[in-house]
Amino acid sequence: MEYRYSTVVDPSTYETHGLCDGIPLRCHESPELEEIETLRCQEDWRRWVGPLGFYKGGLGPRWNFMAITVPECLPERLGVLGYANELAFLHDDVTDVADYGDLHNDDLKAAFEQAASTGHIEGSASGKRAIQAHIANEMMSIHKQHAITTLEAWAKFAELGSGRQHTTHFKTEDEYIKYRMIDIGTMFWYGMVTFGMGISIPEHELEMCHRLADTAYLNLGLTNDLYSWQKEYETAVAMDRDYVANIIGVIMEERNISEAEAKEVCREKIKKTIVDFRKIVDDTKARDDVSLDTKRYLEGLLYSLSGNLVWSIDCPRYHPWSSYNERQLDWMKNGIPKSPPKVNGNATANGNGVHHAPKESLANGTLNGHDRIHAPAVNGNGASHTSSIKGSTGGNGVTHSPVSNGSAVVNSALSMEIDTDLVNVFARKEYKSINGFKMHEGDNHPSNGQTKLNGNVTSWKVPGDVQTKVIQAPYDYISSLPSKGVRDHAIDALNVWCRVPAAKLDLIKLITNMLHNTSLMLDDLEDGSHLRRGRSSTHTIFGAGQTVNAANYHVIRALEEVQKFGDAESIVIFIEELKSLYVGQSLDLYWTNNAICPSVDEYFQMVENKTGGLFRLFGRLMSLHSSHPVKADLTGFLNQFGRYFQTRDDYQNLTSPEYTKQKGFCEDLDEGKFSLPLIHLMHSAPSNLVVRNIWTQRLVNNKASPAHKQTILELMKENGSLQFTMDALDVLHAKVEKSISDLEARFGVENFQLRLILEMLRKA
């Protein structure tokens, strides 16, 4: 394996206690990338979740965890892995001491599964989920497929391991080791190493890969147990437990020997795993039936073993006598750098040769005159002490919470309370009088007349009256079709800022979904579309008359729901944006039915009405009913988002295999819609008789033949229409990002979830 980002450390400068013979230690060339994001994660936890007390995580005076356990990590990925690993350490401490550890694991699992499958994490207004959304967003922006693989692996880790049996009293070594192989995070390590090194294990080799790596996973678990024994023992005592879920305790009890003797038994087991795994790696290197990436993964794990050992021997997390180095203490006291150092000049490349410009880091603290971001000051024991931060606003306009006496005074604008179940066991004693907050805000707040599926309001529950079944049927059908729920996700993301009370938020989702589904019913009928989400369109099943009647009925039903807000302004917003939807659709239909090609400006005016109207509707309702003391106009952002959303849809309709599967090949051309690529083609080739005649034939036949659609698509490529659309998407994406940044500064809160939604749309 080629080593590009790490160097071998002089063995005379570190200790191994004789437990890693034959495996050198390698250290990443830019460990400060990890340090910055590790401290940032701690600050985010203080701000979003609660105080850390005497917590210590992945930093060490000489060696940081990720820098020596994944030394060949691609530089642009080291920061986010350091951030994610710090969350893992925090989560580990939570499940050690929490009364409901499995609930926290279930929550972690659900969040990562959602991020991997939909790009959305529900309930992102809660602290932990906001942190997870940030991780997912950063990873997706680097490499979507590697990120999805890692998020799925971490979800599996949360499901099977992650301390789920910390309270189990294991009786035998074999029983415990079987559990520990899962709990050490087979899937967690797999996710870290593969994402960090840009590795893609072939699906057919995955089972074999893990089987070959089992010995390494066992080593990692045993090493962790050996050096974390004292910490876990003290935690068990503090929690009034008479046992410790650690190999040392299990050996002592099963063999009836002393602690010192049990540790020696553990050391011998560790030595054996080193010998065995070195042989496995050497044997695998010689095989020609194993992929290069599987070999790279196993060799990467080899250095994880030496790194994990050396870090464990002197890290502050396991050893109270160990402190931090000067740079770390300086950053803890005076603030971390505003931006991480540039990696490899002006850009970095991932394993696939994709270049990424260095990103400006998230501003999670106040800026001083030295381009620093203030984090809570920390003493040599890792405990926060009084800081001079006074919740001031930094250069980016983000307001941050003051820190005092080891606790985070949570920003009142967030209206979030400290969850003492998520606080280190030693700090819990100091905060036992503080009330916790709900794990999922908005849970257990069902509004009358709605059905919730995975937290998203999907349909109105009809009364038992038989007379309504007929008029309800078309709506129920369209509501039952699979949906990505982008609007629900966007509402959840905006609520990070707006803090709309749960009952009102559910009402906004219900109204939005009603209007969205009715618009789909009418659009498919008016456009002559026979497919919706890969299924038959509503009007092809229920007929045009019933579909129109049901759609109109549910517009009235939506208005009834708006009345429940109890104020006139909500009704005004509803009527204004509903009118916009109809005006936008009228322009689209007029251009299509009369074969009139609009200008680009006219097209975007139509989009702001037809697509942007629904986004503005829920955005304006959320602003009106926001409990946040800061008020901001979301209209500009939502208009830009609507433009981006529709332009992306235009492009995907012509180029995406998934769209072809769901709606048919180039369906927009069948319908005669003037999408942005077609508008560009018409205006860039006004004298092209092929284009004009094909479009005339489409009007005559009310559809375009597959051959005609293919011809139009080829002309779009030749005339640069698809490239023009891609360029437009880049510009619109930048404008949406700028709007998000402006709103983050206005509200004083980073919106990781909204950025994740935008990134998923860009990558899809």
Curated annotation (Swiss-Prot):
Motif (NSE/DTE): 224-232
Residues at which Mg(2+) 4 binds: 523, 527
Chain positions covered by the region annotation Disordered: 377-403
Enzyme Commission number: 4.2.3.-, 2.5.1.29
Compositional bias ranges of the Polar residues kind: 381-391
Annotated positions binding Mg(2+) 3: 523, 527
Region (Prenyltransferase) location: 325-761
Binding site for Mg(2+) 2: 92, 96
Reaction(s) catalysed by this chain's protein: isopentenyl diphosphate + (2E,6E)-farnesyl diphosphate = (2E,6E,10E)-geranylgeranyl diphosphate + diphosphate; (2E,6E,10E)-geranylgeranyl diphosphate = talarodiene + diphosphate
UniProt-recorded Gene Ontology molecular function terms: lyase activity; metal ion binding; prenyltransferase activity
Residue numbers binding dimethylallyl diphosphate: 532, 610-611, 646, 653, 663, 673
Residues bound to Mg(2+) 1: 92, 96
Family: In the N-terminal section; belongs to the terpene synthase family.
The protein's name: Bifunctional type I diterpene synthase tndC
Species of the source: Aspergillus flavipes
Taxonomy of the source species: Eukaryota, Fungi, Dikarya, Ascomycota, Pezizomycotina
